[in-house]
Structure formats: structure tokens, C-alpha cells
Amino acid sequence: MWQAEVRVDLDAIRENVSWLRSGSAAELMAVVKGDGYGHGMVPAALAALDGGADWLGVCTLDEALTLRREGITAPILAWLLAPGLPLHEGVAAGIDLGAASVAQLDEMVQAGRTAGRPARLHLKIDTGLSRGGATVSDWPGLLTAAAKAQADGTVEVVGVWSHFVYADAPGHPTTDRQLAVFHEGLDMVEKAGLRPRYRHLANSAATLTRPDAHFDLVRPGLAVYGLSPVAGESFGLRPAMTARARVMLTKQVPAGAGVSYGHTYTTERDSTLAVIPLGYADGVPRSASNSGPVHLGGVRRTISGRVCMDQFVLDCGDDPVAPGDVAVLFGSGRNGEPTADDWAEAVGTINYEIVTRFGSTRVPRSYDGERP
């Protein structure tokens, strides 16, 4: 018996990946960073591979090594690498590494020497996000250093990549500008004498809306889990996560009763209150106070009063509600329950954050569609 749970439909992940894979001639990297966007990195990775993913993408070296320890042999790219990490462990495990500066490249050269095999690198160019990646002015120097290291046998340049700013806003001119910069960067790669097998730029949004940005490899993340990166468009994706809890306690209160800390909510009539054992320690944003949608007893309700660390309250009015009844915070939406998109809109964030925070807390995570 569970008090609260996050339930993940692995068949939904398989279905989403299969559909995404069928829509492009490019190979597909399923991004499973952030504990698989809260869905569980290893189960999500295995389901994505079942669905046809060719690659897995993660941020950290630890994430990549965890996948290897779990017996996953598919190609893995890790790209958020601070100085001083034991990169030789990644090289020895056959993990591809993202490089965005000569300093990073130098560390990877040393890692290749220590591991006794070339470090497989994906060189990243900053096409406009101003985050990771070499600037356009630094790009030629990185290419020159990479070409020399490859000639020395300490690295192998496997890929060249970048990341979009506005792909979730189809038609935004920045996307076209970034694509042009990426093409210019690829021309420089060729002039430097490098011939990487993979050129990749497309995130979920570009995978869905910009086939001209698919190149050799696409990198969907959010879409793998059935959520759309483009507002107002579902693309037929199937959400994989449901968050729910059982009613812990019900009580009758009179009209005018203040509810939860600060009494920011007051009952307008005699009402039944339902106490739900989930709070901000479990991923419920405190900003969901008086705004978060919850489905209980066949009715979509709104959190009444402030979200506490471990619980929140619903004003159920005259509706019959009892301890043990199931309150669904979000799911696929097929049965009238809110979705992660509804939650994102209610609290002023994005669906990425909703599933990642709910799935990475003390709430037990369970799975449908597990395979031996």
C-alpha cells in the first residue's frame, strides 16, 4: 500500500522514442540526464533503447558511469564536465565526452593517455545560447588543437554539436541564425582537416519541428517522456509520469475557517477539507499554494491555502471524500486529471521542472511496463 507515489509508464517512453525515431533519418540520442527527467535514469534509458534509441545523453560523468555499471553498452555522451574530474574513467568505459575549450581538450588528452586509448570527443560550438560551447572566435583555436591531438592519437573527434535557444518557439529568427552559425562552424571543421561522424543540434523541439536541423543525430529529452516542448502542441506524445497520493484525513469545518499557514485561504461555506500527504519536500512547488490543480473524486480542484513541507489541503465543499481516496496531481490527462503542463501554467514554470522535481524526491517511484 502506498501513501504517495510517482508512477512511470515505461511503455509510453518506448512508444515516444519509437515514434520520434521513425520521423527522422538521423540516429537518436535519448537524453536521460537529471535522473531521466525524474522518471528514473536507468529504467528510462533501458526503455528508450527498447524503443529504438541509438545513443544516450547525460550531463555528468557520474551519470554516464552509472549507466555503464548497470550493463548498458550503447554509446553515451556526457557533456557537463568540471575541471579535475577522473575523465580517464569515462574514456576507459567508452564514454564520449563533450569539449568546449582548449583547457577541456587538454584534460581529455591526458585522460586518453592515462586510459591507454583515445578519448572520444564531441566538440561544442556556441551558436548563440551563450552557455556551453566555444565562442565563434575561439572555435578555430579549439579545432586546431583537436586536430593536433587526433593526429597524436590521444583523442578521436567523433562529433560536433551545439544547442538551440528558441527551438520551442517555431519560426523564431534566432533559430535560423543559429543554424547558419552552425553551418559556418562545420565549414571550419572541414578546413581543419577533421571529419567527425556526427553533427548534432536538434533538441526535442527541433526534432519535432525542424527537419533541416536533424543532421546525423537528434537529441530529444522532454519528448522522450511524452511532454511537448512547444506550447499548445502535443504532437501525439504520451506522457509517462503520474503523481498521486491518498487522502490522509478529512474534516468538517465551518464557513470562514482559515486554512494552512497564514490563512491565505478561507472557506466560503461549511466544507469538507481533505489533507493530502505531499508537500514541497516531495516536489510540490510552494508557489502552487492556492493554484495547484488536483483531481479528486471525479472533480478537478485547486490547492487551498499554502503548500507545507509535507502536506497540502483541498476544500472539497459538499462533495463526499474519504481517507484513502486517490488524489491525482497530474498524469496523461486522459481521465480528466491535470497534466504536467497544467501544473507548469498554474505555478509559472515549465513542464520540465514539474516532472523532474516530483520524480527526484522522497516519494516512491514505481513502474508499469517493466521487462526482464
From Swiss-Prot:
It is an enzyme of class 5 (isomerase). Its EC number is 5.1.1.1. GO terms for cellular component: cytosol. Substrate binds at R131, M309. Keywords: Isomerase, Pyridoxal phosphate. Its cofactor is pyridoxal 5'-phosphate. GO terms for molecular function: alanine racemase activity; pyridoxal phosphate binding. It catalyses: L-alanine = D-alanine. Pfam families: Ala_racemase_C, Ala_racemase_N. Pathway: Amino-acid biosynthesis; D-alanine biosynthesis; D-alanine from L-alanine: step 1/1. InterPro entries: Ala_racemase (IPR000821), Ala_racemase/Decarboxylase_C (IPR009006), Ala_racemase_C (IPR011079), Ala_racemase_N (IPR001608), Ala_racemase_pyridoxalP-BS (IPR020622), PLP-binding_barrel (IPR029066). The modification N6-(pyridoxal phosphate)lysine is found at K33. The keyword Isomerase applies. One of its GO terms (biological process) is D-alanine biosynthetic process. The active site is at K33, Y261. Catalyzes the interconversion of L-alanine and D-alanine. May also act on other amino acids. PANTHER family: ALANINE RACEMASE (PTHR30511), ALANINE RACEMASE, CATABOLIC-RELATED (PTHR30511:SF0). HAMAP family: Ala_racemase. Belongs to the alanine racemase family. This is Alanine racemase. The gene is alr.
